[in-house]
């Protein structure tokens, strides 16, 4: 079975590249594209899909983007697996994105090979963080251990 995937990003080149990687890898087929949070919510309401690959920030959208958009998706489509593409270097925001119900997070500078792996993991319900983001998170964690009181934060 080929996964039905919706792509959302405000940059046409990113959508074109994401579609090309998804379809050439054989991991799924793109059944719809959106360039804003508003278009995404309308598309999700009308087009069945198995997984969403979305940008975090789509400025200029009449509806909210970022956390507000994720919240709307989680409320209206609670079982939809979400993989987020991001250029953010803010580890606090990235952690909050994952805490909000996004299962996968891929840095837009990641290798093209990583996207199909991330899609497969997220569809199976497994969390996925791209290598480059994982390395940054680990580096920040080890820095905090050296600079802090030596006690890691407890899980929530």
Feature locations, PLM:
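Conserved active-site segment of CheY-like receiver
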Residues: 10, 85-89, 108-110
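Two-component/phosphorelay signaling modules centered on CheY-like receiver
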Residues: 12-32
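Acidic, metal-coordinating helix/loop segments flanking the phosphotransfer/catalytic sites
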Residues: 33-51
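Conserved phosphotransfer cores of two-component systems
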Residues: 45-47, 72-80, 100
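Two-component signal transduction core modules
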Residues: 52, 82, 105-106
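Active-site residues of response regulator receiver
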Residues: 55-56, 86
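Short amphipathic alpha-helix used as the core "switch/output" element in two-component signaling
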Residues: 63-79, 95
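Short, flexible helix-to-coil linker/hinge segments that flank and couple to helix-turn-helix
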Residues: 92-99, 103-156
């Amino acid at each position: 079975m080929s996964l039905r995937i919706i792509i959302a990003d405000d940059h046409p080149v990113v959508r074109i590249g994401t579609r090309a990687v998804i379809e050439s890898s054989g991991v799924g087929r793109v059944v719809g594209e959106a360039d804003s949070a508003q278009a995404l919510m309308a598309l999700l309401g009308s087009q069945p899909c198995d997984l969403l690959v979305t940008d975090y920030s789509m400025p200029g959208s009449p509806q909210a983007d970022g956390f507000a958009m994720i919240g709307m998706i989680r409320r209206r489509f609670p079982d939809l697996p979400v993989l987020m593409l991001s250029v953010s270097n803010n580890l606090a925001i990235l952690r909050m994105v994952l805490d909000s119900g996004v299962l996968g997070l891929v840095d837009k500078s990641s290798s093209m090979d990583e996207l199909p792996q991330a899609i497969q993991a997220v569809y199976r319900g497994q969390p996925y963080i791209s290598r480059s983001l994982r390395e940054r998170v680990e580096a920040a964690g080890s820095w905090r251990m050296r600079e802090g009181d030596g006690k890691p934060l407890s899980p929530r």
